[in-house]
Design a protein with these regions (language model features):
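Short loop segments and helix-boundary regions at transmembrane helix junctions
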Residues: 36-51, 55-121, 221-233, 250-254, ...
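Transmembrane alpha-helical segments in multi-pass inner-membrane proteins
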Residues: 203-259
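Hydrophobic alpha-helical transmembrane segments
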Residues: 21-25, 70-75, 97-101, 145-150, ...
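Cytosolic-side transmembrane-helix boundaries in multi-pass membrane proteins
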Residues: 255-262, 266-284
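Membrane-interfacial amphipathic/re-entrant helices at transmembrane-helix boundaries
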Residues: 1-29, 283-284
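Structural signature of hydrophobic alpha-helical transmembrane segments
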Residues: 16-28, 67-78, 149, 199-212, ...
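Transmembrane helix-bundle core of multi-pass membrane transporters
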Residues: 7-10, 103-160
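Helix-loop-helix "hairpin" substructures at the membrane interface of multi-pass membrane proteins
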Residues: 140-217
Length: 284
């Protein structure tokens, strides 16, 4: 026990561990807030689609030699979120088809660019890190943490400011339109916030596992709670808890950060499913 405590104290003496915890917890909180809305609107896979777009944008940033890929990844992901929303409203192309079309195309272009114009000799390692976030969160700099904090504050503030409108759009968009409210504007806000979350989460779990941060906490909360507010609060608590446990386990056990967080989310989801069975039986 003494060796474990000494090892733990040693790890937390390194700044990169604190950076990883701060960024991880903020990203988990942001992704859980909007995850409930995306799941209820049956648009949860927009996270998967935008993450593939972000992967392609990172490849473009590497191609032009930018040291900070945020200048390319963020605007491209936001524009793609808007395009996904507009294309999904097209009668000829439904939402699922639009997501598949844009995400698969971006993923293919990104992987091709990384192979044709490699930024380093270890192409496989670069792709693995981008897709699964295996090491990037443990190599964060102080400037990365500051950017993450600023973007997280923007996301949380936007969610709180437009909370009631987001709630209305989630449950009865047609009524909002009939009442004269421009629901498309709030759908656009949801898409932009989602794009910001995707860009933030790239360093944590990689582009292939981002949807897990959005979906699992929301689904876990829905096992036990029914009201929108309760589900959002529970989802945020679950997401932050899983991120903290996942990062801590990853550092201590040497496992990949992203996959460890997702596995923790999956385990918590099954625990909530079991608890929901007991609560149903007790209520009967």
């Amino acid at each position: 026990m003494g060796d474990f405590a000494a090892k733990l104290q040693l790890y937390f003496s390194y700044p990169f561990v604190w950076y990883a915890l701060i960024v991880g917890l903020l990203i988990a909180l942001c992704s859980s807030l909007l995850g409930v809305t995306l799941v209820l609107k049956r648009f949860s896979y927009i996270g998967d689609g935008l993450s593939h777009v972000a992967f392609g944008a990172m490849a473009v940033a590497g191609l032009v030699g930018l040291t900070n890929d945020m200048y390319i990844v963020l605007p491209i992901t936001v524009i793609s979120a808007v395009l996904l929303l507009r294309t999904g409203q097209n009668a000829k192309i439904n939402g699922d088809a639009a997501i598949a079309m844009i995400s698969v195309g971006a993923l293919a272009v990104g992987y091709m660019l990384m192979n044709v114009f490699p930024s380093s000799a270890n192409i496989t390692g670069d792709v693995c890190t981008t897709l699964f976030g295996s090491t990037s969160i443990l190599t964060l700099k102080e400037t990365d943490v500051i950017v993450c904090i600023i973007m997280s504050v923007v996301v949380i503030a936007a969610f709180l400011i437009f909370y009631h409108k987001i709630f209305a759009v989630t449950f009865d968009e047609n009524f909002m339109k009939a009442a004269g409210v421009k629901a498309n504007i709030y759908n656009l806000i949801i898409a932009i916030i989602t794009a910001l979350i995707i860009v933030l989460a790239m360093n944590l779990v990689g582009s292939l596992l981002i949807s897990a941060l959005i979906i699992f906490p929301a689904l876990s909360a829905m096992r036990l709670f029914k009201s929108f507010k309760s589900v959002v609060i529970c989802s945020a608590c679950v997401s932050v808890f899983c991120a903290g446990v996942g990062i801590f386990t990853s550092i201590m056990a040497g496992t990949p950060v992203g996959s460890t967080i997702v596995v923790t989310d999956i385990l918590v989801f099954f625990i909530f499913c079991i608890l929901s069975l007991f609560t149903r039986r007790s209520s009967q």
